[in-house]
Structures are given as C-alpha cells and as structure tokens.
C-alpha cells in the first residue's frame, strides 16, 4: 500500500511536439490527496507538526507538541498548512492539536505515526484538515515544463529482439509421418509397451521430425517465420492402466531431457530440420518443461489427495519443520530424508530407479511429494500436475540442473522456448533460470533468443508479473484469446477495447505487449472452429478472427490444422487431429469449416480458403512494418465494429484497420490521426475515403470482414502546444503495482516516456515508454520502504518531434 503526493502541471514546450511534467508520490504513508479533503472546520487550538525531525526544523527537541516553529497556521480555506525544508533521512511524525498529546492524529487519523523517507533535502508543504483529521504532503519546487535535461529521459518504445514472428504451432506426432520405421520408438511389444496405435486418439500416430522436414514448403507457404514444436524429449511411452492408459505422444511426460524421443526421430534429424528451416528464414522453438517429469514416483501410502503445509510441513533430515519458499532463490537448502521429510513417502519401482536423465532427476527428495494439485492456493506450485512428478523448484540443485539442460539445447541451435506450466513454478525459479538461460544465449551470439511462458490466466494483471519480474521475454496472451473469440462470435467490440487497455501492464524499459504471442485456440483448450460453433457463418468468423490476430499487436500463432478448417469436438485429445491420413474414426468423421469431413486422407491443401487467407495476412504483415510492429491506437469500439490505427515510428504513416463482426455491413464515423488525408484500401473491400479537417472519416465495413486503409501522408502534427497532466495526483494513494499515467491530446500519435526518482536524488530510473493518446505505465512500489517520497516525470513527443 502507498500514498501519493503529486501536482499536475501544464506542459511548456522547448520545441513543438515535446512536453514534460513532474509529480511526486509518497509510498505507504496513509497521507491524503491535496485538494480532495472535505470542507474543513475552524480550529482554535495550536496545530503542530510533531515528529523526530522537529529539531532539524528549528525546535529545541523532537516530538514536541507545543513547538511553534513547526506550527501549521490556519489558511483561508480553514485548513492548517505550512512549508518546511526537510533534510534527507527517515522521519516519523503526527499532527498534535492544542499543544499536547491529548489530541493527536497519525495515519488515517489514528495513533500510528506517519512515515517519511527523503533521499535528499526537499521543500514540503504539510496540510492538516480539521474535518477529516487527515494530513497531506506536497512536494514544492518540482521542475516545470520541458528542459534540456528531459531529452535524456526520452526513450523509444520497446520492440524486443526476436518478437516479430508468425508462429506455426505443431504437435509433431500429429503432423506428418516421414519415417514409419520409428513409429514404435524402438520399443518391442504391443501398444501398452511402445504407445503406438494410430486408431486411438490417445496414442502415438506416427508423426515425426522427418515428416516436418519433408513438409517445410507447406509450413513456409503460410508465411510462417517460426515453428513451435510440442515437447520433443524422450517420454514415458505409456502411463495409466486399462481404459485410462494413454501414450506420451504429446511430449509432456519427459524422462530424458537430453534426447529427442525415438518416436519422433533423433537429435541429428532435429539439427537437420533446424538447418533447413534457418535457410528459409524460419526459426525453430522448443516447448519445454521445468515443473514436472513423467509419473515415475509413487506414494507408499497409496493416497494422492493434496496435503497442505499447515497440516504436514516439510521436515529436514533432523526433523525440523521448514518452508521451501524460505530457501527459494538461495544457494542453500536443508538436507532431506525420503522416509521422513514429506507428507507422502516417495517410492519408485526398482526397474525405473535410473530412468530419468540427467541423473539428478532420480533423487526423489527433489520433488514436492504432496499429492495432486487442487489448482488453488499453495497447491498451484506444490501439487502434482495430475499425478506427474512435481519438482522441488525451490531447490538450487533443480534450478542449476535445468539451467544446464536448456543451455545445452541452445547449443544445438534452438531459437527459443515456449515454457510449459509456468504458473505452477515458484517465481524465484524463473527469476534465476530465465536470467541465466537468456544471458547464455546472448553470450553465444543468439541476440534474438526469445522465451515465452504458459500462464493459464486471462488477466494481464496475473500474466504480466512473469514478464515484469523475470527475464522471461513474454507470455502466451490468454487474455487475448478469450477476448478475440468473444468478438469473433459476435459480441460487442468493447471487449477488445478493454483487452488492449491493459497492454500497459507489460510496458517496462525492456518489455512491451507487442511481444505477446497471440492465439485463437490450442491443443489443450480446443480449436477456434470449435469455439465458434453455433455462431453462424463459422468459416467467415474464423477468417475474421485470424484477420484480427494478424493485424493487431503481438505475434500470431496458428495451431496446426486450423488452416485446414479443423473444428474438433472439444479440448485435449478432441483437438489433436493429424494432417496426415487419420485412422481414428472420430477424427475421420470430424467436420471442417470448409464444409466437408476430414476423412481418411492427407490434409495439406494449400488452396482452401483458410490456408489462403492466413497466407495473405502473413504477406500483408510482412510487407507493411506498421502492421507488424507499429504502435496500435484505438479509434473506434462500438457494437460490432472495432477500428484502430497502426503507425510505424519511422515512416509515421497511418494504417487504419477496421473489423466488423456482424452479418451485415456497418457504417461508422470516427476520428483518425491524420486530418485531411486520403485513405486507400490496402486490404479488403473499401473505396478511397478522405478525412475532414478534424480527421473524421466515415467507413462502411463489410460483413464479417476486415479492411486496411493507408493514408497518403504522415500523421498530423498539433496546430499549437497543448497541455499535459500527470497522475497520480498530489497525495493520492497507490498500492503494489501502481498506475502512472499522462493525459495528453486525443487522437494523436505520441510516445510518452515515464521515469521516477526518489525525491532529493539526482538520477532518474525509466519506467517505460507508452504509445498513443492514453499513455500509462505501472510502477511496482512494493519494494520501496514505507514513507519513501518518489518523484515521477513524463516526457511526451508527438509527430512534430
């Protein structure tokens, strides 16, 4: 929790198009906002600012309720206020009334002292309100307007290395069978031994790396620039018994983290695939896991319900209770005993005691051993993922072991990682692991190495900490998937507006929402075709959803089969159809969005509408930098029409994108960023249109379609200097990850850089650069001591430069 002391200012231009202003904030103080108190009542007694700084302000001693040197005289507005120059230091104070401690007010008008921390001497105005018994602090003397020093605060918006890809996400076992000789993974026996049964949707079907390699033309034809493979490491071939038995075709039951699963091929075949892909300008990403291994460990008790730490804490080898979280991020960890340290006693079949590679994974004390996760509370990170062996990722051996494992795969040539089950691993692990792995990649000259995590939440507030607080490059944008599916089904465009309004959570000096991989469905939740069932015109709506994905910020991800119009009957196994001829009766009978059943033949058609549409969108994106990496500024969001501008910061030419999710064309009027410009169609069916002097245009957007219009000139420059105001306001309260925003002119292209420093300090720390006419960043103040006084500054640059 924190409180803000702030002041809004008009901007003053050193040159056209550049403006700045400052405000200040007080962390966790309990102080109130200047100018927000209720009307005050007159007070006849002496009102004194009493604290441990009084001797610095002219009093003979501290905590003197009767010292007039720190009195707060009554102002014309019947509040009590005075200005003091307070030296650097950590201070505490109250307001005493009547010259004694009989009546005194601290935090929230109570007994607790206000706290104040200054990095340097500062002129502060203290204001006490009789009616509310609350006190506000305002920093005086903040620099007004734009100055020469502000140039050093201006930074370009971030575009992260390796963050401009078109992904094709493929489940290797279900893509193409290029080498039938490896279908049983070099394992003798029947399907319960080797896991191969192409007639069962829960077993291996024969797809492999050789099949991927042989079909790179098909993948490249979609405009793909990066292939993301499901986990390819050696898996436990079969888990479960009887009707519950299934195979590790999906790749998430790993036993050997150093080898490609024999069902899929060899390490040498992977290297050959990577080399060929690279020659085509296509990267190869691995889906990786650190949360768990295959289900090798059993519990001697024969029970698997989660046991929480309050009921049964961990105990070291000497029997002392401890919390692994207390050691996370450190180089030490208590010695453990498999017989006595865990809620459940871990046991392993003697035939499998050495099955895991690297060898350290066979140590059963490196697992949580608490039973199956309940998907809430502590079990999210301590529980077994549906029986899979959940690693003790707080342990330095696990951290160091996985750093080495994945550094070795970087050496093989992998271009990036998609990190499975990231939310089920403690944050301290990611803070160390991501830094070590990324630093290693960079040291090998892999400057565009990119990692994104799977955090299964549709809320930027829950997703963004994995980007803000670690060196994870980005996260899968589950919030995007949810909002886009709703829009494609015909719901209001307001959902998209709300989605993109949270992009600022990802804005830091090194990260940005533009790096988020965006997707419409996947192998777990189900396909976009399935989500659209019952909405009518499902094929056109899928094309609309893909248009939105390729024309908005982020890195589009196409799940294999969506380009063929696969629908499926749900998530998991029901969304994992193969592109090569399927022997699964259910898959053969599944319908496609193109109006026919999948059947028992290969489906690598390049002339079907969805494949052609995606390829066209990829070509459009590749040929127009603004559509790939440009700023995205909302222009219209009402009913079924969503419109926005994309602007590349170098060319500064507006690309207006408008989409309509209704079954009839819609005509809308809105203000663009380029008054007087003529816009011509770059994509879609629309006649040229000219904006009036205020920038207004009227568009008729075709049913279930998108149009892209290109302006004939750069974005408009302001006619005259405007004004800028900055939030937080003086004395306003902030908590945790606090918003810091600037109010600038509407309907403009602008870049606004934010920074902070402790009041009294010299150096500024950047918070990030926001784009568009509603700039905002977030500042995590949770690490600042209570009472720290912080100064914020925003510098906004528009098209005038």
Where on the chain are the PLM-derived regions?
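Substrate-binding/active-site clefts of carbohydrate-active enzymes
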Residues: 159-166, 173-412, 433-444, 450-453, ...
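Hydrophobic beta-strand segments within extracellular beta-sandwich modules
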Residues: 93, 790-792
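Carbohydrate-interacting/catalytic domains
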Residues: 2-5, 25-29, 39-42, 46, ...
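Aromatic-rich carbohydrate-binding modules that target alpha-glucans
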Residues: 43-90, 98-117, 769-770
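Structured interaction patches on ligand/partner-binding surfaces of diverse proteins
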Residues: 99-134, 692, 696
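Surface-exposed, short loops/turns at beta-strand junctions within beta-sandwich domains
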Residues: 86-87, 781-789
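Active-site-proximal helices and loops of the catalytic beta/alpha 8
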Residues: 149, 274, 278, 291-292, ...
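Conserved structural position at the C-terminal beta-strand
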Residues: 97, 794-796
């Amino acid at each position: 929790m924190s409180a803000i002391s702030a002041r809004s200012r008009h901007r003053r231009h050193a040159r056209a198009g550049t403006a700045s202003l400052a405000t200040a904030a007080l962390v966790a103080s309990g102080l109130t906002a200047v100018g927000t108190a209720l009307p005050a009542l007159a007070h006849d007694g002496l009102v004194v600012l009493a604290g441990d700084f009084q001797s610095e302000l002219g009093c003979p001693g501290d905590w003197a309720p009767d010292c007039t040197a720190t009195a707060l005289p009554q102002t014309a507005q019947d509040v009590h206020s005075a200005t003091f120059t307070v030296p650097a230091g950590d201070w505490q104070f109250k307001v005493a009334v009547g010259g004694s401690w009989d009546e005194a007010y601290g935090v929230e008008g109570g007994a607790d002292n206000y706290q104040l921390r200054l990095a340097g001497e500062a002129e502060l105005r203290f204001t006490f309100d009789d009616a509310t018994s609350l006190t506000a602090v305002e920093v005086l003397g903040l620099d007004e307007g734009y100055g020469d020093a502000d140039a050093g605060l201006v930074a370009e918006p971030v575009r992260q290395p390796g963050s401009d890809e078109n992904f094709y996400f493929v489940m290797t076992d279900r893509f193409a069978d290029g080498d039938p000789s490896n279908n049983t993974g070099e394992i003798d026996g029947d399907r319960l031994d080797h896991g191969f049964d192409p007639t069962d949707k829960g077993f291996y079907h024969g797809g492999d790396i050789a099949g991927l390699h042989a079909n790179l033309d098909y993948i490249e034809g979609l405009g793909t620039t990066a292939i993301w493979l499901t986990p390819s490491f050696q898996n436990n071939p079969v888990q479960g018994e009887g009707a519950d038995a299934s195979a590790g075709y999906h790749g998430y039951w790993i036993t050997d983290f150093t080898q490609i699963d024999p069902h899929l091929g060899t390490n040498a075949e992977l290297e050959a695939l990577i080399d060929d892909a690279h020659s085509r300008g296509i990267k190869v990403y691995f889906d990786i896991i650190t949360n768990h291994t295959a289900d090798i460990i059993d519990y001697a008790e024969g029970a698997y319900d989660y046991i929480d730490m309050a009921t049964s804490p961990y105990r070291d080898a000497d029997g002392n209770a401890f919390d692994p979280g207390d050691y996370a991020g450190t180089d030490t960890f208590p010695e453990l005993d498999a017989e006595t340290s865990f809620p459940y006693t871990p046991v392993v079949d003697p035939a499998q005691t050495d099955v895991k590679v690297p060898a350290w994974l066979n140590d059963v004390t490196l697992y949580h051993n608490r039973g199956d996760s309940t998907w809430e509370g502590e079990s999210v990170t301590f529980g077994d993922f549906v029986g899979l062996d959940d690693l003790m990722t707080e342990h330095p051996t696990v951290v160091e072991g996985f750093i080495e494992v994945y550094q070795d795969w970087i050496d093989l040539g992998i271009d990036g990682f998609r990190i499975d089950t990231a939310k089920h691993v403690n944050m301290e692990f990611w803070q160390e692991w991501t830094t070590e792995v990324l630093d290693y990649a960079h040291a090998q000259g892999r400057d565009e190495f990119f990692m994104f995590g799977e955090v299964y939440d549709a809320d930027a507030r829950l997703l963004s900490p994995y980007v803000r607080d670690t060196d994870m490059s980005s996260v899968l944008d589950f919030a995007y998937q949810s909002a886009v599916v709703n829009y494609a089904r015909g719901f209001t465009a307001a959902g998209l507006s709300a989605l993109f309004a949270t992009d600022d959570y990802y804005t830091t000096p090194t990260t940005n929402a533009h790096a988020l991989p965006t997707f419409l469905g996947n192998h777990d939740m189900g396909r976009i075709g399935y989500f659209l069932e019952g909405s009518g015109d499902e094929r056109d709506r899928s094309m609309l959803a893909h248009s939105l994905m390729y024309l908005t910020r982020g890195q589009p991800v196409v799940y294999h089969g969506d380009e063929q119009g696969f629908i499926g009957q749900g998530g998991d196994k029901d969304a994992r159809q193969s592109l090569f001829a399927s022997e699964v009766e259910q898959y053969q009978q599944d319908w496609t969005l193109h109006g026919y059943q999948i059947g028992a033949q290969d489906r690598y058609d390049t002339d079907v509408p969805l494949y052609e549409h995606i390829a066209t969108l990829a070509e459009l994106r590749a040929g127009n930098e603004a559509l790939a990496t440009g700023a995205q500024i909302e222009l219209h969001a009402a009913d079924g029409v969503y419109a926005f501008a994309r602007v590349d910061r170098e060319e500064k030419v507006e690309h207006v994108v408008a989409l309509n999710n209704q079954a009839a064309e819609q005509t809308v009027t809105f203000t663009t960023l380029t008054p007087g410009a003529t816009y011509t169609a770059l994509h879609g069916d629309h006649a040229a249109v000219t904006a009036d002097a205020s920038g207004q245009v009227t568009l008729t957007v075709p049913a279930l379609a998108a149009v892209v219009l290109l302006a004939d000139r750069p974005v408009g420059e302001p006619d005259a200097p405007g004004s800028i105001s900055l939030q937080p306001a003086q004395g306003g309260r902030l908590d945790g990850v606090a918003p810091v925003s600037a109010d600038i002119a509407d309907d403009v292209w602008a870049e606004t850089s934010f920074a902070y420093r402790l009041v009294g300090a010299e150096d500024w720390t950047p918070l990030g650069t926001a784009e568009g006419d509603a700039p905002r960043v977030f500042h995590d103040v949770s690490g600042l001591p209570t009472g720290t006084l912080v100064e914020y500054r925003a510098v906004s640059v528009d098209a005038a430069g």
